[in-house]
UniProtKB/Swiss-Prot annotation:
The chromo domain recognizes and binds histone H3K9me3, histone H3K27me2 and histone H3K27me3. The acetyl-CoA-binding domain mediates crotonyl-coA hydratase activity. The acetyl-CoA-binding domain is required for recruitment to sites of DNA double strand breaks and for binding to poly (ADP ribose) moieties. The modification N6,N6-dimethyllysine is found at residue 129. Induction: Down-regulated upon neuronal activity in response to an enriched environment, NMDA injection in the brain or seizures induced by kainic acid (at protein level). Up-regulated after social defeat stress. It comes from Rattus norvegicus (Rat). The keyword Cytoplasm does not apply. Residues 1-10, 132-143 have a biased composition (Polar residues). Residues 117-128 have a biased composition (Low complexity). This is Chromodomain Y-like protein. The gene is Cdyl. Its EC number is 4.2.1.-, 2.3.1.-. It holds the Pfam family Chromo. Residues 353-585 are annotated as: Acetyl-CoA-binding domain. The keyword Repeat does not apply.
Amino acid sequence: MGLGSSQPSTKEAEPCTLQEKEEHPVDDTRQQNNAVPATVSDPDQVSPAVQDAETQVESIVDKRKNKKGKTEYLVRWKGYDSEDDTWEPEQHLVNCEEYIHDFNRRHNERQKEGTLARANRASPSNARKQISRSTHSALSKTNPKALVVGKDHESKTNQLLATSQKFRKNTAPSLANRKNMDLAKSGIKILVPKSPIKGRTSIDGFHGESPEKLDQGAEDTVTPEVTAEKPTGALLGPGAERARMGSRPRIHSLVPQVSGPVTAAMATTLAVNGKGTSPFMDALTANGTVTIQTSVTGVTAGKRKFIDDRRDQPFDKRLRFSVRQTESAYRYRDIVVRKQDGFTHILLSTKSSENNSLNPEVMKEVQSALSTAAADDSKLVLLSAVGSVFCCGLDFIYFIRRLTDDRKRESTKMAEAIRNFVNTFIQFKKPIIVAVNGPAIGLGASILPLCDVVWANEKAWFQTPYTTFGQSPDGCSTVMFPKIMGGASANEMLLSGRKLTAQEACGKGLVSQVFWPGTFTQEVMVRIKELASCNPIVLEESKALVRCNMKMELEQANERECDALKKIWGSAQGMDSMLKYLQRKIDEF
């Protein structure tokens, strides 16, 4: 019944008043039909029917929040059934505090009963423990200093047992009724949480430890390289993995024991069919095999074990983003690899050198990533860098440390590393796209013409100050620079070390296109995905046709340049020039 409805005057008065300052519309058509219209001469005057309605409230059934956030109560009227209940705003019930308090008390009791029932359904033993603890705490609060001994102790113990048994008897029928309830008919949906471990690539061999126990710092400093001396570990199967998260009973879903050499093909198969994890991939050494044995029987909780002689080195926090969720990201230390749909993304992020400088370790990792991309289903490779610098060329500090030991032998090793690195770019059959996000210096700029498309950030700049370094050019720049920008501009860059802005490099042909810094990444990814949607055979054949007459010439130029570097680095004058350059850099800093 609404507030505008009239009630028989023979009803007994209740100690509840219903105040209304303005007319309250009633939506229920049945109430309007049954109500006697109230005649009000003045719109501001409350009708006698409304004034008399304060005696007609029987109880409050429910409450809610309206669109404006105000509380409304569902009122049960005397002489009417539940179909005639109406929602009334709280300000109309200011004198019905007795009914409101009664409703709130019943509402709170129902909530407590529901919470206790859920706890009992999950574990009845926990409920019994809870009632025992609460009873014990109540007794202890009564007289916390008194020691309960003798008959007093016995009587209180019996009291606790009686309370527990009474609770058990009362809760047993309700639990039985719940078990017999048809969940399908009741519309209740049971959501089973998905294990966060399921589908997540394991980056190292940890033994049955839940992810909540892992220290955040330790997780960030994980270095994924696993040596052949890695101890025997236990891997969890899908069933046991779910059991560890509490979503399923523990099931010993056995992973077949693998004893003896594990080849790369076997590890790939295990990873694909879902019965293996990435420790197989991580445990592969350079020769492609490693002895490892796995079993899920007798799994015990333990700490993560990291076996890496370089784990004491600081981990670059710039890598704490989604690339570390991919399996290939854990194979390298100085680069990050993302295997995406149709292409492979290689990012320079060196730990063993500063500003993404190149030393033999970084070069080997880039070569390994390119070899993997050449063999898989990637249509092209995107090469970029993490941070504000693309590549600062060779790591001269690394070279100086080794040249002081055995100059002739170390100079040969370093020249050979550069030769293999450059040849990898020359011989790579799939398109290589470079996204230059910052300065590209020395070898970092020389390899750009060996790639197929170069996109640059507006803030990037390019320089090859080889004479300042005290070395001869590298990266086939003696051939590619004159072909791209002409002899005069090439000599200006290679001899005098002229610095080119991104726009100047684009005008000379070293860069294909320049993008605004704010949208650089988005522009690159849009164009990469367009290229990745093309036919891979068309892409490879197109590159082969463009490079067919240059491959042998580039390999010969690379050989000549490395021989010159070997000669310079093996001489005392070359060492002095390099030391002078480093000293100038230190003074400038």
